[in-house]
Structures are given as C-alpha cells and as structure tokens.
C-alpha cells in the first residue's frame, strides 16, 4: 500500500485517482530502495568526480579510466532482505544483479568481491544462513565464469536475523564500447531480452524497504527472485555481442521494480517518454496481469534501445543465444510513461514525476545516550591464552573454507588470490588492479564518523601493501530504520566520515547503494551500522609484489604507523567479553602520508612481505604473516606506557608490517612517517618480547588457530 502522504502528492499531480498499475509503479519506484528518499541529501556530500572518472553515480555502474584505451566498470549492491528469507537464491541473484549492471555498461565482468556479515555460528539458523549464502554466491559466480577474488566475512550477534550480502563487481572494456542507460531518440524501439517474465520477485523493491518480520521466511518468499546462472551467461554474451556490433543505443538491466523500473528510468534519463505494450512481454506463466508483468523482478533480463532498422538483427542475436526477446514498446517525445494492456491504457504518468518525484528529506537525528556496552577487561593473567583466543576467533581465522568454494582463477587474470589483504588482477602486460572491501562495524557502532573514516583508510592500506593507489570507491550503506533518530544519526555521521577520508586520499566515491530497515523482529535487534565499501587501485606489475606472509629468513620486520591504546570496538574486547566498550582509535592526521610511504616502499621492489594491520592488531597481523616461517619481535622500546594487551591488540588505523632484506633503504623511503625495525623473520615460531612479557607461539599453534573456522565447518 502506498503511504497516505505519497498518495496525496500523486493525486494532486495526476489530477485523479491513480490506477492499480500506477499505484504499483509508484510503490516500487518511490520506495527507499529505488528512490533513496531518506539518503539522497547525505549522498550528495560525497565527492564523485576526479580525473579518472568518466561516468560517476547515476548509471548502472561507474566507468573509470584505466590506460591503453581500457576502462573499468565498477558497481556495488546489496541483497540483504532476500538473503534472509531465501539465502541461496537471495545471494545468487545478488551476484546476478550486479553482474548485469556491469554488462549494461558494455563491460565484460572480470571480478567479484563479497563483503558478508552474519550472526555467530552457534545457532542452527545462523549456520544454515551462512552455508546457503556462500553456496548461492559460489553456485552463481562459478557458473557465469567470473572470479571472486577478495571478500570480507564478519560475525556479530547483531546480524542474527538480518545477514548482509554485499557484492562488488568489476568489468573491463575499451572506452569506445562504453554503453549507458541514457535513452537517445524518440521512435527507437524497446526490446526486452533474456529470460521470460514470471511472478518471482514481485514487489521486491518495496519488500527491501521495510523491516524483516518474524514471519518473513514464509510470507516474503515470493518477493525473492530465482536466478539461473546459465541463462545469465547467455545474456552476457548476447548483450556484449549486440553492443560490439553497434546495435544498442542504450541499455539497462532489469533489477528493482522490474520492467517498470528499467524502462521508465532509461527513457527519463534521456528526457524522453516510453510507450509500453505489456502484452508483448514474453511470459513464463499464463494469465499474468499488467501489474505483475511490469513489476515482477524475474532475473536475467535486459531492456535495449534499438533503432528500427536494427530490430531484426538484435532479435536474431537473441534467437542465436536461445533466449526470449520481443519488441515491447518504443520511446516517445511526450515525456510520459504509458502502458497498454489488452488494448487499454492502464498507466499514463509524467515520467519525470515517476522516476524523480519521490519526496526526499533529511530525517531527524539524535546521538544515542548510551553507545558503550560492557566494561574494559583487566589485563589477562595468561596473555598467551588471550592471544590464542583472538587468533581463533572466526573474525580473525582464515576464510579458506569460504573462498575454496569460489573459482577465483577463471579468466586467468588473477595474480594475488583470496586470503591476502587485496586481490590483484592483470589488466595489461604491465598494469593490474588491486581490489579490497569491507569495514569495521563494531567501531562504527561506537563512533560512526570515525568508523566511516577507518573503513576508507583500512581499504586504502590493503591496496597500499600491494603498491596500489586508490582509483575509485563504491559503497553499500547498510543501516537500520532511518525513522529512528539514533539510526539516522549513525547513518549521517558514517557517511560524513567516509566522505571526509575519501577526500583526504583524493579517491572519488563513484557509486553504490543504500540498504536501510535492516532490523529483525525475531531477534529484536538492528544491525550495527555497516558502511561497507569496495575500493580499486592501479598496480604496477613490472615490480614484484610483496607477499602477505613472511617469505625470506633474515628479513628485517618494520612496523609502520603509530599504535595507540584506544581499544573500542576491537576484536580483543569482543573475545574478552567486554562487548563494545572504550574509545575507538582515531584516524591519524598523517594517514595519507603513511599510506603513500608504504606505496613507495612497495614500488621500490625492496619488500619481500607487506601486510595491513587491522582486526586483531599487531598480534594478529604478525601471526597471520607466520604462514610458512616464524619471526622474532622485540617491542619493549616502542610500546611506551601501553599495557601489553593494548599494544598487541589495538586496531589503530593506518599501520602496516613490512619485511625486507634492505632495512636501511626502506627506512629512507619511510622517512617522515612513524616506523621502527622491530625484529627479524625466521624460525618455527612467533616470539614477541615486551617490557614485562614474552610470548612463544609455534607455527603449529598458529596454524590450528587460523583453521578454526574451517575445522568448525568440516566437523558439520
């Protein structure tokens, strides 16, 4: 049902009662999911332009200039609500939707990333959601031949009842082949191609704009789309061939709000109208009505603008790939969205009003009185036991059980595989891209502004340890109910933090999506604010890339950046039962300089190993690097007055661990930013010495801790 206030606005504009079909169009296109009515004022604060940005926000995906005539398409989407109701299909179609966004820009998809957020795996329900979502992503991505090269998986009890499935997709094409969703000329035909239209996903856009109820699994299952990756692969090849042959004037994939959304947005973007003949749509089910035909979100469908003389050629291509296709309307000079069904006009709406008339507003915001939970833990009597507890946490442990289900080498571009700070793909003989994703939800819950800044800095450092400078950022802004002033305050401040940090690094925010109403009636919880981002950067492949693990005995270990005692939102506090207590470590003012110095050190070719320090702090970072060999570290001189657990587990941003056989030369490159040589690589254990403590952890103990998630899943 349309909100009463919206209905009043619509009646006034139309001068009459809207028809049932018109109400459906407004219900979906004016939903939070489609119109960003609560978030639009905040999204305008991002810097979205830059020297490499060809197309920024507003199209199906952004287009970023690379080199040698190549451009990158990048987009990010969420499929959160559907993945709770039907986890396999919800996750699978989340992949399919963002992949079609890339295709509709004329680019071939070359990489996926999947930041995922779950409740702890100690309940059958959370375990089921986790397993099925991973299977859904793997089942779809593997079948269409697009590698998943990086990801993040984070567990927290607040995601019980509302897991988050965010997907980043990257594509590649020549600049002259770039396509847009901006309609070109009145009189051109609209062709719907791909799968036939059924009733699956009906009302998906409006479904994604409300909280999840206790009965959601049963009641909302029809709102979840069902995907077919083999059809998606055919749609991909057919679309790219049609674009390559010059038949397509503009193009848009069918996602939220189905044909009604895609065809109206395509026409409106070019200042034109559209006349749709709903009967002409290839239908999967008999006796579908106009409402269902227009708004069903059946997957694997595209709408093309085609000149009349090219219609037969496009339909021949559709037939060649054994797909469904038909002319379902045309573009008009009159800027109206008109729908005919069985000889009658069932909708006739000013198109700009439909696609851009939803009232937007910045909602009331108010800082929560109590943001902290629990209290700071005492310094542990058994430091090694605490250390091992952190290493064994599912948030710190290896995610090999997940990424081994993905084909991460298909297309033969993968240079750095999953399991390191960022994935790396080869684009040309000399250049590649690094990709990273994620955020720190617990820190953002305590301090949304700092949490937003930290997300940018951490991902930038993930790229930096591979020598990559950031080119572009996309985001999925996952929050609770924006009508709650405290939630909107979180949202507003996290967005401001993201934007400020991105500007400090001169990286434009070129696209993404907003997912609100992530709350669960079943668990009486809202998700922690989760401003998940994807970041890509350019890598020089002529210089050997450092490993994320210790690689050469005798290398000097260098700590870059400054460690501070603030521990708010840390994995250590969570493992010690402290909840979200304490102050979140601030992003240092010299973070851009630190990141730049690390990039220069990597580009020098003098590093054998490099790793970002984030979740779990220096302790977890060192342990992670001890995959093949150990190291001896002495921090007694640099820990200052910090307690041992503070120094080991602080998650202060803008830090990295480097290993080199040429410490003097690397230190010269790091001149001007905080750094210190803290030890050497070698041996069969990690040894850490401080003022008042010594730790000895064998490689076997580290391996067992890192395999905790894999062992848990393999035990069934």
Curated annotation (Swiss-Prot):
The UniProt entry lists the main location of this chain as cytoplasm
Which positions bind Mg(2+) 1?
77, 513
Q: Where does Mg(2+) 2 bind?
A: 101, 253
Q: Which HAMAP family match?
A: PurL_2 (MF_00420)
Q: Which GO terms describe its cellular component?
A: cytoplasm
First and last residue of the signal peptide? none
Q: Which GO terms describe its molecular function?
A: ATP binding; magnesium ion binding; phosphoribosylformylglycinamidine synthase activity
Family, per entry: Belongs to the FGAMS family.
Query: What Enzyme Commission number(s) apply to this enzyme?
Result: 6.3.5.3
Q: Which residues bind ATP?
A: 36, 475, 512
Identify the NCBIfam families for this entry: FGAM_synth_II, PRK01213.1
A Pfam match is: AIRS
* Catalytic activity as recorded in UniProt: N(2)-formyl-N(1)-(5-phospho-beta-D-ribosyl)glycinamide + L-glutamine + ATP + H2O = 2-formamido-N(1)-(5-O-phospho-beta-D-ribosyl)acetamidine + L-glutamate + ADP + phosphate + H(+)
Source organism phylogeny: Archaea, Methanobacteriati, Methanobacteriota, Stenosarchaea group, Methanomicrobia
Describe the subunit structure. Monomer. Part of the FGAM synthase complex composed of 1 PurL, 1 PurQ and 2 PurS subunits.
Q: Which InterPro entries does the protein's record reference?
A: PRibForGlyAmidine_synth_PurL, PurL_linker, PurM-like_C_dom, PurM-like_C_sf, PurM-like_N, PurM-like_N_sf
Q: Where is the active site?
A: 33, 79 (proton acceptor)
What positions does the entry give for substrate binding? 78-81, 100, 225, 297-299, 515
Known function: Part of the phosphoribosylformylglycinamidine synthase complex involved in the purines biosynthetic pathway. Catalyzes the ATP-dependent conversion of formylglycinamide ribonucleotide (FGAR) and glutamine to yield formylglycinamidine ribonucleotide (FGAM) and glutamate. The FGAM synthase complex is composed of three subunits. PurQ produces an ammonia molecule by converting glutamine to glutamate. PurL transfers the ammonia molecule to FGAR to form FGAM in an ATP-dependent manner.
Could you tell me the Gene Ontology terms of the biological process aspect for this record?
Answer: 'de novo' IMP biosynthetic process
Q: Which UniProt keywords are present, listed alphabetically?
A: ATP-binding, Cytoplasm, Ligase, Magnesium, Metal-binding, Nucleotide-binding, Purine biosynthesis
Q: What is this protein called?
A: Phosphoribosylformylglycinamidine synthase subunit PurL
Pathway in which the depicted protein is active: Purine metabolism; IMP biosynthesis via de novo pathway; 5-amino-1-(5-phospho-D-ribosyl)imidazole from N(2)-formyl-N(1)-(5-phospho-D-ribosyl)glycinamide: step 1/2
Q: Which cysteines are joined by disulfide bonds?
A: none
Q: Report the subcellular localization.
A: Cytoplasm
């Amino acid at each position: 049902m349309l909100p009463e206030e919206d209905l009043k606005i619509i009646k006034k504009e139309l001068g009459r009662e809207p028809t049932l079909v018109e109400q459906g169009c407004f219900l979906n296109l004016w939903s939070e999911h489609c119109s960003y009515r609560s978030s639009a004022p905040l999204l305008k604060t991002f810097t979205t332009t830059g020297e490499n940005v060809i197309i920024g926000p507003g199209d199906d995906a952004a287009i970023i200039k690379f080199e040698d005539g190549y451009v990158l398409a990048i987009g990010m989407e969420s499929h959160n609500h559907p993945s709770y109701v039907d986890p396999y299909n919800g996750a699978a179609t989340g992949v399919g939707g963002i992949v079609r966004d890339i295709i509709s820009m004329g680019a071939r998809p070359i990489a996926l990333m999947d930041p995922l957020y779950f409740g702890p795996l100690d309940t059958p329900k959370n375990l089921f959601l986790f397993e099925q979502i991973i299977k859904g992503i793997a089942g779809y991505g593997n079948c269409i031949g697009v590698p998943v090269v990086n990801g993040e998986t984070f567990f927290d009890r607040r995601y019980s009842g509302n897991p988050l499935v965010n997907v980043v997709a990257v594509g590649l094409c020549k600049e002259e082949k770039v396509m847009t969703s901006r309609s070109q000329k009145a009189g051109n035909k609209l062709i719907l191609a791909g799968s036939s239209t059924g009733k699956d996903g009906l009302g998906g856009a409006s479904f994604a704009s409300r909280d999840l109820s206790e009965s959601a699994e049963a009641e909302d299952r029809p709102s979840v789309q069902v995907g077919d990756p083999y059809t998606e692969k055919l749609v991909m090849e057919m679309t790219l061939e049609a674009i390559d042959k010059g038949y397509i004037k503009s193009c848009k994939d069918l996602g939220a709000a189905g044909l009604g959304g895609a065809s109206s947005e395509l026409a409106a973007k070019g200042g034109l109208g559209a006349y749709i003949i709903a009967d002409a749509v290839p239908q999967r089910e008999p006796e579908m009505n106009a409402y269902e035909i227009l708004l069903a979100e059946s997957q694997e469908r595209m709408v093309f603008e085609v000149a009349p003389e090219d219609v037969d050629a496009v339909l021949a291509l559709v037939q060649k790939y054994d797909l469904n296709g038909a002319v379902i309307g045309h573009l008009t000079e009159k800027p109206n969205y008109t729908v005919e069904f069985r000889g009658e006009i069932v909708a006739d709406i000013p198109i700009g009003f439909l696609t851009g008339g939803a009232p937007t507003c910045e909602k009331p915001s108010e800082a929560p009185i109590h943001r902290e939970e629990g209290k700071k833990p005492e310094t542990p009597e058994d430091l090694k036991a605490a250390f091992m507890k952190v290493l064994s946490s599912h948030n710190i442990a290896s995610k090999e059980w997940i990424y081994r289900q993905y084909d991460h080498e298909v297309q033969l571009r993968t240079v750095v595989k999953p399991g390191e700070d960022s994935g790396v793909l080869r684009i040309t003989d000399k250049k590649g891209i690094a990709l990273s994703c994620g955020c720190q939800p617990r820190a953002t819950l305590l301090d949304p502004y700092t949490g937003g800044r930290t997300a940018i800095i951490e991902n930038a450092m993930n790229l930096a340890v591979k020598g990559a400078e950031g080119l572009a950022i996309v985001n999925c802004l996952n929050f609770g109910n924006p009508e709650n002033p405290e939630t909107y305050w979180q949202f507003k401040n996290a967005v401001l933090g993201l934007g400020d940090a991105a500007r400090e690094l001169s990286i434009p925010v070129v696209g993404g999506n907003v997912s609100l109403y992530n709350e669960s009636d079943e668990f009486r919880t809202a998700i922690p604010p989760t401003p998940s981002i994807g970041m890509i950067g350019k890598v020089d492949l002529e210089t050997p890339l450092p490993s994320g693990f210790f690689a050469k005995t005798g290398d000097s270990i260098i700590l870059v950046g400054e460690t501070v005692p603030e521990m708010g939102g840390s994995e250590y506090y969570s493992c010690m039962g402290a909840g979200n207590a304490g102050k979140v470590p601030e992003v240092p003012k010299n973070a851009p300089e630190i990141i730049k110095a690390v990039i220069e050190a990597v580009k020098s070719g003098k590093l054998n190993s490099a790793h970002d320090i984030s979740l779990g702090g220096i302790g977890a970072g060192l342990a992670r690097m001890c995959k093949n060999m150990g190291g001896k570290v002495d921090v007694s001189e640099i820990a200052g007055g910090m307690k041992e657990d503070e120094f080991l587990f602080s998650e202060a941003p803008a830090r990295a661990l480097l290993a080199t056989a040429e410490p003097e030369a690397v230190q010269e490159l790091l001149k001007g930013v905080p750094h210190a040589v803290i030890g050497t690589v070698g041996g069969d254990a990690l040894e850490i010495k401080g003022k008042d403590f010594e730790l000895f952890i064998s490689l076997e103990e580290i391996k067992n801790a890192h395999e905790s998630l894999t062992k848990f899943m393999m035990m069934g």
